[in-house]
Amino acid sequence: YRSLYGLQGIKTMLRGTLRNDGFCAAWDVLVQLGCTDDTYPMEGVESMTHRSFLNAFTGYHAARKLEEKISSQLGLAADGPELARLKWSGLFEDTPVGLNEGTPAQVLEHILNKKWKLEPNDKDMIIMWHRFRYAKDGRGNEIQATLVAKGDDSTRTAMAKTVGLPLGIAARLILEG
């Protein structure tokens, strides 16, 4: 970003991304539990529900609900944003997973795609705002840049245009020399 915004002389630069409240922390819960592991096939996937999938990572406890076990295991508030996001994603539902086999990561992806999938006429949008505050020659300065990208439909999405397409172009250029 330094050269892109003409900030080559800046000694220290920090970059961060803000997402919806609780999103990153909720994803971290899934990582800590082991739900994103793609190195081994799970057993019994064909009979799993969303809830039993998540329960597979918490250990058996006859008297405690899944939500309580996750809260206790990871030191989370029972009414915190992490569990609220997991609940919104449908992970505590007794809905059948709908796969015959898969790794934890594949099962999780399948569950989340049911909730996050765009319908044929849906469109996505990416809004980015960069603000750089820096000191140069003893004076405070600021540069701002924005990007708004709109998807055309559920296939030609803003995400595909801004992430997938540039990556595909780069790969093709590398392959073509």
Positions of predicted regions on the chain:
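C-terminal catalytic/substrate-binding lobe primarily of soluble NAD(P)-dependent oxidoreductases
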Residues: 1-177
